[in-house]
Amino acid sequence: KELVRWKYQRYIKDYLRCIASVDDNVGRMLDYLKETGLTKNTVVIYCSDQGFYLGEHGWFDKRWIYEESLRTPFLVHWPSVTKPGTVNNDIVSPIDFASTFLEVAGAKVPNDIQGRSLVPLLKGNTPKDWRTTFYYHYYEFPGWHDVRRHYGVTDGRYKLIRFYEPDVNEWELYDLKTDPHEMQSVYGRSQYASIQAGLKKELNRQRR
């Protein structure tokens, strides 16, 4: 009971305090840039390494492939390049950051670096060959958090997941348009057969 109380009270309260502190201090930094006249010559990028559960699905923390954890904050303020209030729905990844920072700074991007620069996307010119799926794999089990090993792939509209522990062999498929909170798996339903087969093919490709 004490652990449960800590997880759902102290831990989440600490997390929310952290968010409030970050918000306050990002604001202070933006105010400083404005006051010193540096705003027009500074690119501000805010991101995180993962999302977080605040009770969704009955969970806290991260790790699972569901949307609340899989999606991460990524905000960019680049005067004369990004338009305030615009949203880009392309699939990006932290592996793209290094290439992006190098290009923004005017440095050469090595040919063998992982990821691709996000600069074209920030300018509103998404390359035709930009990725259309995202692969995720969680393998840290057993552990105190008791999150089972699983992997999956999403194209932004649909998400296919497989839990593969020796005592678990389960698949889940979600239609994120009709079920954005991922409450009802549609895996095995005939109307999703082609979607399911296509995502399995893509999952196998990504895992090679």
PLM regions and their residue ranges:
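Short, solvent-exposed loop/helix junctions and linker helices
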Residues: 16, 69, 88-91, 95, ...
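Generic structural signal for alpha-helix termini and adjacent loop/cap motifs
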Residues: 32, 36, 104-107, 124, ...
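Long, internal low-complexity/basic segments
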Residues: 1-10, 18, 22, 93, ...
